[in-house]
């Protein structure tokens, strides 16, 4: 209905315009202005909104839009099939030397050897005796070189050496270890006396030894983590650590032990295990 009214008004406006033009063509003094001027004085307002038309056909498919943001991580999928075996990798480093194996079975007896010649041992005994004397003298000379010149002390199983470089406790541990030894551990009276005599005759007053309570306060152990169960030689009223900072041990030239602070620097004694022949 609204559309019909709009159409009717539009047709009436056109009829009026045509009538004016017709009167002008007849010379009648109706209005001397042009049709454009006449129309310009009339304001044509838009009509009311019409009814919705029928829905048009579906348009063509548009272009692909921009790629959206990455979505959240999905749920872990099922385990896939085992892949083909890969190439053989590089050989790894050589492992540590294993433990010594058990003694093997006794082998088959060998063939009987050829008969030996009769020995004229008289002259050889004299040579052997002279060699024994030479070896004894050589051992005495070697002991002199070790003790006096090189400054080494030894027992049947170990060598002991005073390192005349002032280092703190941890540096002393490292120094001995990188040279194949350990900070000296006097685990019995014999070794303790040997080291104390060594220190005194070298003209020193104190040295670091391999005893500490760095792991647990008050529980002193040797540097190989064995406890002081069988032997210790503390100075009277030692160990005493009221401030809790004296976690390392020094040996005095008297052979007595004293707990001291680990950051202090002094000479120290390394021990080395003798290689078995």
Curated annotation (Swiss-Prot):
Tissues expressing the protein: Expressed mainly in the liver and stomach, but also in muscles, testes, and intestines.
Listed InterPro entries: C-type_lectin-like (IPR001304), C-type_lectin-like/link_sf (IPR016186), C-type_lectin_CS (IPR018378), CLec_Tetranectin-domain (IPR051663), Collagen (IPR008160), Collectin_CTLD (IPR033990), CTDL_fold (IPR016187)
Pfam families linked: Collagen, Lectin_C
Domain of life: Eukaryota
Keyword Glycoprotein: yes
Glycosylated residues, chain numbering: 11, 258
Region (Disordered): 41-103
Entry's localization field: Secreted; Golgi apparatus; Cytoplasm
Compositionally skewed regions (Basic and acidic residues) per UniProt: 49-67
Name recorded for this polypeptide: Collectin-10
Species for this entry: Mus musculus
